[in-house]
Amino acid sequence: MLRWLRGFVLPTAACQGAEPPTRYETLFQALDRNGDGVVDIRELQEGLKSLGIPLGQDAEEKIFTTGDVNKDGKLDFEEFMKYLKDHEKKMKLAFKSLDKNNDGKIEASEIVQSLQTLGLTISEQQAELILQSIDADGTMTVDWNEWRDYFLFNPVADIEEIIRFWKHSTGIDIGDSLTIPDEFTEEERKSGQWWRQLLAGGIAGAVSRTSTAPLDRLKVMMQVHGSKSMNIFGGFRQMIKEGGVRSLWRGNGTNVIKIAPETAVKFWVYEQYKKLLTEEGQKIGTFERFISGSMAGATAQTFIYPMEVMKTRLAVGKTGQYSGIYDCAKKILKYEGFGAFYKGYVPNLLGIIPYAGIDLAVYELLKSHWLDNFAKDSVNPGVLVLLGCGALSSTCGQLASYPLALVRTRMQAQAMLEGAPQLNMVGLFRRIISKEGLPGLYRGITPNFMKVLPAVGISYVVYENMKQTLGVTQK
């Protein structure tokens, strides 16, 4: 179909100069099915589908947002031609940015190199699979004509947008703070897109955490009290009986407030650690990204850890025990001293390595599997695949680090339990295993897993809508 498109609508001579209007007119007439001189979105959808032209996600809506100058919901020929010409200029710039050796062709090695600039590492074999989805003549290289034909109606703006699909970031927030920070391109930094994306992610995290707060508090209660008899329904009944429905959100305020300082610190120190681990001009690899991200997570956790302790104390506390965050901090300082704000800090720090490492490794494994087996017609995996990979990799990371998270939570709260010995990390591990067995180290993991799917869905929807509101993406 791409060969037909090149021969019938976009001849090879087009790469040498401006396209004759009659060529655009031929395509316009093919799309204008009722012959009324304009193309509406339904005609565009049906026409492009019947022509077999590759489309990006929500491509038709984006084309109309950009091309429909008078906002009448239809494209006349002048608007149609102007959109294609403007879009082709952007695609020419994208092609040149990929064509590193300026030979007029894109090769697999150049795709690998360009992906690395976005912090995404793939093999040469995987790059060849991507190349095959664009290559129309089987030469295993992509020239300008093939490139233009493939992205003719795919309304991406530049090469970074084209290959950004597999960045390990989709606005997912499942309530954990140990993930490796996002990578931002130079253009995103200069344009200010980076802080808008961080803000969108922060708002999405706040909404997601608030929506799943009852499950999070239940998890904390099961971790701290460690009772085999406390199941999910019994736990909810007990919390509602003790403090009413509002008590299900106890501790959520602190959990939301800490998003902003933690994100800011993690992002800033991540950039500093990357500079320390890589030479100037060198692109960061997966290993350096893992080390930098883990160190950034540890630094951010050190900075906001007192809020983690207060979140646990508020969640476990009884009605009337604390009037709010300030009252909780004041009582901890008065009765236990400043050191109490860092109880459980060591297991929390140790949990960062297995969580971040396994999260990143599983995501890379899933990405490689998809590229090897399914990247035949498009490099874009789609929203469901991205969300699924992100959720699954985070879940695997949680499984590995959960025992450390449980011990951390108990150390944070053990001063509140009457008659409970004040044990260190090793002592708590021994006590849990001797009294509850190995399953005791995973107490509360069921509600933790139950919140993953709603958290992923809510945070993604809010994140995408906030990006539109903040001007990161077009509506």
Curated annotation (Swiss-Prot):
Solcar repeats lie at residues 192-276, 284-369, 381-469. Residues 1-173 are annotated as: Regulatory N-terminal domain. Activated by an increase in cytosolic calcium levels that induce a conformational change of the N-terminal regulatory domain, uncapping the channel and allowing transport. Inhibited by bathophenanthroline, mersalyl, p-hydroxymercuribenzoate, bromcresol purple and tannic acid. Residues 216-250, 308-343, 405-443 are mitochondrial matrix. One of its GO terms (biological process) is cellular response to calcium ion. Mainly expressed in colon. Also expressed in the small intestine proximal to the ileum. Weakly expressed in kidney but not in the liver. Keywords: Acetylation, Antiport, Calcium, Membrane, Metal-binding, Mitochondrion, Mitochondrion inner membrane, Peroxisome, Repeat, Transmembrane, Transmembrane helix, Transport. SMART domains: EFh (SM00054). GO terms for cellular component: membrane; mitochondrial inner membrane; mitochondrion; peroxisomal membrane. InterPro entries: EF-hand-dom_pair, EF_Hand_1_Ca_BS, EF_hand_dom, GDC-like, Mit_carrier, Mitochondrial_sb/sol_carrier, Mt_carrier_dom_sf. The keyword Disulfide bond does not apply. Residues 1-197, 271-293, 364-386, 464-475 are mitochondrial intermembrane. Electroneutral antiporter that mediates the transport of adenyl nucleotides through the inner mitochondrial membrane. Originally identified as an ATP-magnesium/inorganic phosphate antiporter, it also acts as a broad specificity adenyl nucleotide antiporter. By regulating the mitochondrial matrix adenyl nucleotide pool could adapt to changing cellular energetic demands and indirectly regulate adenyl nucleotide-dependent metabolic pathways. In vitro, a low activity is also observed with guanyl and pyrimidine nucleotides. Belongs to the mitochondrial carrier (TC 2.A.29) family. This is Mitochondrial adenyl nucleotide antiporter SLC25A24. It comes from Oryctolagus cuniculus.
